[in-house]
């Protein structure tokens, strides 16, 4: 499925006259396909799907991707997962893929399982505070690469003290989307 999505994405971008920028994780997908491990529908992918019993991680993945000698801090991994998804959501808002912050929040929770306790990706950014979020993304980008770089629109919004949701009137609470 991932391969089909990639090929369609490339075709769509070319049709729009845009350039496709490959992601570093694509080499993993390509390698898995070379190993004839196309996924659950094929009966094997990152996981083994025995007819009897529970699925389990395919041990062969460690042949090319062995565990690192030094494992990252769990809290840092959690932060990276939350922040990179929030940054991508801001990009989607900037590009018009989604037009309403509430739609982005609901979609992130119900669509792909972003943690509900955050209120959604954009609510997470607002809870952290836009300036603090941008500063932390700058730190993450310096440590882990450009996927954490925030769009200029978010940096500008943070500098102006703006938010994604309007502030409630005095004495009122923001209602749920």
Predicted regions and their residues:
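N-terminal glycine-rich phosphate-binding loop for ADP-containing cofactors
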Residues: 1-177
């Amino acid at each position: 499925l991932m391969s089909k999505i990639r090929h369609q994405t490339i075709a769509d971008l070319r049709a729009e006259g845009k350039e496709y920028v490959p992601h570093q994780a694509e080499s993993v997908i390509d390698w898995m396909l070379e190993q004839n491990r196309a996924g659950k529908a094929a009966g094997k992918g990152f996981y083994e799907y025995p007819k009897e019993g529970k699925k389990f991680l395919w041990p062969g993945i460690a042949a090319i991707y062995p565990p690192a000698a030094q494992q990252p801090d769990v809290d840092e991994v959690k932060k990276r997962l939350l922040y990179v998804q929030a940054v991508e959501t801001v990009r989607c808002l900037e590009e018009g893929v989604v037009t309403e912050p509430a739609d982005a929040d609901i979609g992130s929770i119900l669509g792909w399982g972003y943690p509900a306790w955050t209120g959604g990706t954009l609510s997470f950014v607002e809870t952290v505070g836009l300036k603090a979020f941008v500063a932390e993304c700058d730190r993450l980008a310096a440590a882990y690469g450009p996927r954490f770089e925030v769009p200029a629109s978010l940096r500008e919004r943070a500098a102006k003290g703006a938010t994604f949701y309007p502030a409630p009137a005095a004495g009122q609470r923001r209602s749920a989307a």
